[in-house]
């Protein structure tokens, strides 16, 4: 297994819309290894979710584990939200936008259809942090970042803060 490099804003590859995955690809050894590497990368970061587009793989899947013990891994392949309910503000962060946190309003509960890592169709109802994380990671698959929900002024402040952080690292 190997850690994968995580793309960071403003990298234009984060804006690429991910392609659907053929069911036959899901069970291939190469795809299974990619899933394992994404979990390894997410846990190492540390994070609670990682979309394939964040590691420069433009396919519609993501890995998530919101448990404290990191023992409830979920793989969502070709996810599709089929129902939403309520609205709630959560403070979000992102491995591709390091050190930045902002309040984002999302559906409080969702129902999502997807393929699991074995290529089996699944449907899950999710609430709270898991629902927020699924919606956040699905945005990545459509080339959208949580900072896109911010006003243009706040988004520009984020861009400047990240540029300043990069200067200090270099």
From Swiss-Prot:
<comment type="function">
    <text>Removes the formyl group from the N-terminal Met of newly synthesized proteins. Requires at least a dipeptide for an efficient rate of reaction. N-terminal L-methionine is a prerequisite for activity but the enzyme has broad specificity at other positions.</text>
</comment>
<keyword id="KW-0378">Hydrolase</keyword>
<keyword id="KW-0479">Metal-binding</keyword>
<dbReference type="GO" id="GO:0043686">
    <property type="term" value="P:co-translational protein modification"/>
</dbReference>
<feature type="binding site">
    <location>
        <position position="136"/>
    </location>
    <ligand>
        <name>Fe cation</name>
    </ligand>
</feature>
<dbReference type="Pfam" id="PF01327">
    <property type="entry name" value="Pep_deformylase"/>
</dbReference>
<feature type="active site">
    <location>
        <position position="137"/>
    </location>
</feature>
<dbReference type="GO" id="GO:0046872">
    <property type="term" value="F:metal ion binding"/>
</dbReference>
<dbReference type="GO" id="GO:0006412">
    <property type="term" value="P:translation"/>
</dbReference>
<dbReference type="InterPro" id="IPR036821">
    <property type="entry name" value="Peptide_deformylase_sf"/>
</dbReference>
<keyword id="KW-0648">Protein biosynthesis</keyword>
<protein>
    <recommendedName>
        <fullName>Peptide deformylase</fullName>
        <ecNumber>3.5.1.88</ecNumber>
    </recommendedName>
</protein>
<dbReference type="GO" id="GO:0042586">
    <property type="term" value="F:peptide deformylase activity"/>
</dbReference>
<keyword id="KW-0408">Iron</keyword>
<feature type="binding site">
    <location>
        <position position="94"/>
    </location>
    <ligand>
        <name>Fe cation</name>
    </ligand>
</feature>
<comment type="similarity">
    <text>Belongs to the polypeptide deformylase family.</text>
</comment>
<feature type="binding site">
    <location>
        <position position="140"/>
    </location>
    <ligand>
        <name>Fe cation</name>
    </ligand>
</feature>
<dbReference type="InterPro" id="IPR023635">
    <property type="entry name" value="Peptide_deformylase"/>
</dbReference>
């Amino acid at each position: 297994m190997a850690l994968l490099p995580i793309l960071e804003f403003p990298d234009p590859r984060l804006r690429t819309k991910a392609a659907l995955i053929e069911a036959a690809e899901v069970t291939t050894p190469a795809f299974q290894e990619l899933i394992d590497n994404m979990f390894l990368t997410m846990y190492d970061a540390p994070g609670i979710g990682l979309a394939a587009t964040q590691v420069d793989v433009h396919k519609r899947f993501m890995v998530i584990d919101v448990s404290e013990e990191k023992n409830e891994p979920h793989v969502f392949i070709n996810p599709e939200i089929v129902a939403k309910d309520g609205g709630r503000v959560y403070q979000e962060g992102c491995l591709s936008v390091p050190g930045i946190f902002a309040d984002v309003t999302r559906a409080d509960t969702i129902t999502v259809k997807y393929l699991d890592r074995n290529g089996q169709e699944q449907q899950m109802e999710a609430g709270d942090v898991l629902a927020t994380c699924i919606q956040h990671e699905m945005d990545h698959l459509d080339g959208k970042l949580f900072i896109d929900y911010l006003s243009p002024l706040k988004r520009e402040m984020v861009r400047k803060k990240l540029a300043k952080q990069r200067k200090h690292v270099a």
